[in-house]
């Protein structure tokens, strides 16, 4: 889970106040409660308990809802800038870093200044014994004269053995990170999410911390006997939950970043599912696969639209299937939803998971996919979903030469960005129309 000393975003379990103590007792016993942050009361009167997302699983959520506190509403949310606990306020990681670096710098005869203090890391991600620093730190010229010993001091203050510093993601289609290794001899790290092991090289591959709720949702799906095509597999963010927890019979994983493919192969092996997955290396728009998938995952943002034609191509011709379409949607009032052109955005608080569903009369309504919801889905989400549904129906007709019917099952928020941009997932059911006559 991402740890930041400023503008932190943490996952929290939300329930009613009367169930808070039972939830707290269970989470503490399971070592899931994040003691760095305080339990918070939300605007709608519910209570959010910060948790360690890297060890939280769908099983724990079901335990809370069905055994620990029957009748409770158990939902996930994310908290922006959560309040630190009393214990954490004694000396925060940021304060400890500042104190130790300042002491070390002054011992070497360098005058400490407000410029140097402002140039310390504002955020970081912990990857086991490696800390990945934000790109906007250690830019002052004075630091250069203190390398490489400086990095040993920083690592010691943060309690790690290795250090790296991230830069901007390259606009090369493969989302290659520009990460510099400052201390250590390699960038390979391991994460465990929901019982799934992910290994990757932070200098070559991205890891999507903010997608934990979507990975948990995917893991809870019932995909027994199904064939899935994951058009943007990466290191296995969604391929692995579909295989390990959702029970997919087989996955075709498409990826064109060679470094991500190396990590994906490792992750399939260490999770014991390599025999149920075929990797298709290269541009998925040239994929020869067709008439195969019961389900297609299109996990690319800001838009997966370039993959829509191939998604239609790989669906089974006899019964069709379900598309999981990721998209960033702008939510400006009075504007048609458009995918944003930049991913250089700052995370904000995001709402609880929701859905748009279609009733028997064809009227679309909003509701909950994980218990009752406290806020309505945004109209821009619904307008984009309807537009995507129409385009997919047209593509299906073109690809298969006959009409198909489509139906919006759910629209789920994953996370929100500033300004006014939401990462959402549309679950779209696609079925061939029965022959008449």
Curated annotation (Swiss-Prot):
Disordered: region residues: 331-374
Q: Where is the composition biased (Polar residues)?
A: 331-344
The protein's annotated pathway: tRNA modification; wybutosine-tRNA(Phe) biosynthesis
Q: Which GO terms describe its cellular component?
A: cytoplasm
**Out of the domains of life, which is the source?**
Eukaryota
Annotated GO biological process: tRNA methylation; wybutosine biosynthetic process
Q: What class of enzyme is it?
A: transferase
According to UniProt, the reaction catalysed is: 4-demethylwyosine(37) in tRNA(Phe) + S-adenosyl-L-methionine = 4-demethyl-7-[(3S)-3-amino-3-carboxypropyl]wyosine(37) in tRNA(Phe) + S-methyl-5'-thioadenosine + H(+)
Q: Which keywords appear in this protein's UniProt record, sorted alphabetically? A: S-adenosyl-L-methionine, Transferase, tRNA processing
The record's annotation in Pfam families points to:
TRM5-TYW2_MTfase (PF02475), TYW2_N (PF25132), TYW2_N_2 (PF25133)
Q: Does this UniProt record's set of keywords contain S-adenosyl-L-methionine?
A: yes
Q: Where does S-adenosyl-L-methionine bind?
A: 208, 215, 255, 283-284
Q: Which PANTHER family does UniProt cross-reference here?
A: TRNA METHYLTRANSFERASE (PTHR23245), TRNA WYBUTOSINE-SYNTHESIZING PROTEIN 2 HOMOLOG (PTHR23245:SF25)
Q: What is this protein's function per UniProt?
A: S-adenosyl-L-methionine-dependent transferase that acts as a component of the wybutosine biosynthesis pathway. Wybutosine is a hyper modified guanosine with a tricyclic base found at the 3'-position adjacent to the anticodon of eukaryotic phenylalanine tRNA.
Query: What does the sequence similarity comment in the record state about its family?
Result: Belongs to the class I-like SAM-binding methyltransferase superfamily. TRM5/TYW2 family.
Q: What is this protein called?
A: tRNA wybutosine-synthesizing protein 2 homolog
Q: Which organism is it from?
A: Rattus norvegicus
């Amino acid at each position: 889970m991402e740890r930041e000393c400023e503008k932190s975003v943490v996952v929290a379990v939300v329930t009613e106040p009367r169930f808070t103590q039972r939830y707290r007792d269970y989470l503490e016993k399971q070592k899931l409660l994040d003691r760095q942050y305080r339990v918070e009361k939300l605007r709608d009167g519910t209570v959010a308990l910060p948790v360690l997302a890297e060890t939280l699983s769908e099983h724990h959520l079901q335990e809370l809802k069905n055994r620990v506190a029957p009748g409770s509403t158990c939902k996930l949310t994310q908290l922006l800038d959560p309040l630190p606990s009393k214990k954490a306020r004694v000396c925060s990681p940021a304060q400890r870093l500042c104190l130790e670096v300042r002491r070390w710098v002054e011992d070497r005869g360098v005058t400490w200044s407000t410029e140097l203090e402002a140039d310390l890391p504002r955020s970081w991600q912990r990857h086991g014994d490696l800390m990945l620093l934000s790109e906007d730190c250690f830019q002052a010229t004075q630091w250069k004269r203190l390398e490489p010993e400086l990095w040993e001091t920083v690592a010691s203050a943060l309690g790690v053995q290795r250090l790296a510093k991230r830069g901007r993601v390259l606009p090369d289609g493969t989302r290659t990170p520009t990460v510099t290794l400052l201390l250590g001899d390699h960038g390979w790290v391991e994460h465990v999410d929901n019982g799934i092991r992910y290994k990757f090289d932070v200098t070559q591959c991205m890891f999507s911390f903010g997608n934990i709720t979507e990975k948990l949702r995917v893991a809870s799906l019932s995909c027994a006997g199904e064939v899935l095509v994951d058009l943007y597999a990466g290191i296995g963010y969604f391929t692995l939950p579909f295989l390990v927890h959702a029970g997919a019979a087989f996955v075709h994983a498409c990826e064109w970043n060679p470094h991500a493919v190396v990590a994906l192969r490792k992750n399939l092996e260490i999770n014991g599912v390599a025999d149920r997955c075929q990797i298709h290396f290269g541009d998925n728009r040239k994929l020869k696969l067709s008439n195969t998938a019961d389900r297609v995952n299109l996990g690319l943002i800001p838009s997966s639209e370039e993959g829509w034609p191939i998604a239609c191509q790989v669906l089974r011709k006899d019964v069709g299937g379900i598309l999981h379409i990721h998209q960033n949607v702008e939510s400006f009032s009075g504007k048609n939803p458009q995918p944003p052109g930049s991913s250089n955005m700052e995370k904000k608080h995001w709402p609880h998971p929701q859905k748009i569903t279609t009733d028997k009369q064809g009227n679309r309504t909003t509701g909950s996919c994980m218990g009752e919801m406290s806020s309505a889905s945004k109209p821009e989400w619904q307008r984009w979903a309807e537009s995507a549904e129409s385009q997919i129906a047209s593509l299906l007709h073109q690809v298969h030469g006959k009409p198909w019917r489509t139906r919006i099952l759910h629209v789920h928020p994953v996370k929100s960005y500033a300004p006014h941009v939401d990462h959402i997932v549309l679950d779209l059911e696609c079925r061939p129309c029965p022959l008449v006559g």
